[in-house]
UniProtKB/Swiss-Prot annotation:
Belongs to the FARP (FMRFamide related peptide) family. The lineage of its organism: Eukaryota, Metazoa, Ecdysozoa, Nematoda, Chromadorea. GO terms for biological process: neuropeptide signaling pathway. It comes from the Eukaryota. This is FMRFamide-like neuropeptide PF6. The modification Phenylalanine amide is found at residue 10. Myoactive. Its main location: secreted. GO terms for cellular component: extracellular region. Keywords: Amidation, Neuropeptide, Secreted. It is found in: Secreted.
Length: 10
């Protein structure tokens, strides 16, 4: 998986 994943910080 070379595509960056949307990461959400809380």
């Amino acid at each position: 998986n070379g595509a960056p994943q949307p990461f959400v910080r809380f």
